[in-house]
Amino acid sequence: MSSMEMWMDAQRSCRMDQEHPVGPQVAPCSFPQNIKEESTYCLYEQPKCPKASTAEDLTYSRLTTTGLGSSTCTVTDGGGGGGGGSVPVPGYFRLSQTHAHSHKLYNTNGPQPNPSHSHFGLHPTAPARFHTPPTSTSTPATAQEGRNTEEPVSSGNADLQPHAAPGTEEARESSDAEVSSADETEEHDKERQAKSTKGDTKSENTANWLTAKSGRKKRCPYTKHQTLELEKEFLFNMYLTRERRLEISKSVHLTDRQVKIWFQNRRMKLKKMTRENRIRELTSNYGFS
């Protein structure tokens, strides 16, 4: 109920025209008197209305009447600032907007003569309308300030990037050089190891061929005594039976398989020699040489 008492209290109005007349008398306006006067601003914006700035309120009424003419009282829109006869004070911009909103709300069908203060109490949505315009006007200003601050920062970062780029490129080149040198050393080590392993394998192969360390047995030629005994048996009989082969293997200290293989090789050698001798005899008889 305290708010209603504040609305209904006629003694707390901010009108100072009757007590201290400073400017010329204001001509009647097309707007209702309670909206045109500064008392509306003080009623809705009581905490924001400066108590000691009565002279500024009077000068604002004088400027609006002298700047726009004494016959009519038109209201300029205070969104961007810099209009004719408007003062760059935030409270007055709100007042000009309240004039426009009140003109739309209360003068739709024509001017209403002298409504009482209780008429404002019937419309509780009016205070919200007075508080909404400042947010809309202040947000673009803050957005522009944020953009202005971001632009120097971005330009500074753009200036720092070219200076930082050479250092990063040098660091990358040095790291690449180190990596390449490490790769080269690893390749040389691998080549040396491969060469050493190749030499080792060659020596091992020769040693294996001589010592028969691999799965294959060492090539061991027959001794003179063994070859002599086998040659005697071959002259008597080119083909051996199983019993005779076992007897010869025991006498010569060889296995049955070794004796068998030796006789096979000896027969192939004899066949080759007889073929060569036959060809030689034929050529000598016909005199081709």
Swiss-Prot record:
Compositional bias (Low complexity): 132-143
One example GO MF annotation: RNA polymerase II cis-regulatory region sequence-specific DNA binding
Would you tell me the Gene Ontology cellular component terms?
A: nucleus
The record's listing under Gene3D superfamilies reads: Homeodomain-like
What broad class describes the main subcellular location of this protein? nucleus
Q: What is this protein called?
A: Homeobox protein Hox-A10
**Region described as Disordered:** 103-218
The function of this protein is:
Sequence-specific transcription factor which is part of a developmental regulatory system that provides cells with specific positional identities on the anterior-posterior axis.
Known DNA-binding region: 215-274
Q: What is the lineage of its organism?
A: Eukaryota, Metazoa, Chordata, Craniata, Vertebrata
Q: Keywords assigned by UniProt?
A: Developmental protein, DNA-binding, Homeobox, Nucleus, Transcription, Transcription regulation
What spans are recorded as compositionally biased (Basic and acidic residues)? Answer: 187-203
Read off the InterPro entries from this record.
HD, HD_metazoa, Homeobox_CS, Homeodomain-like_sf, HXA10/ABDB-like
State the family named in the UniProt similarity comment for this chain.
Belongs to the Abd-B homeobox family.
Question: Polar residues compositional bias: what residue ranges?
Answer: 103-117
User: Could you tell me where this protein is found in the cell?
Assistant: Nucleus
Q: Which organism is it from?
A: Morone saxatilis (Striped bass)
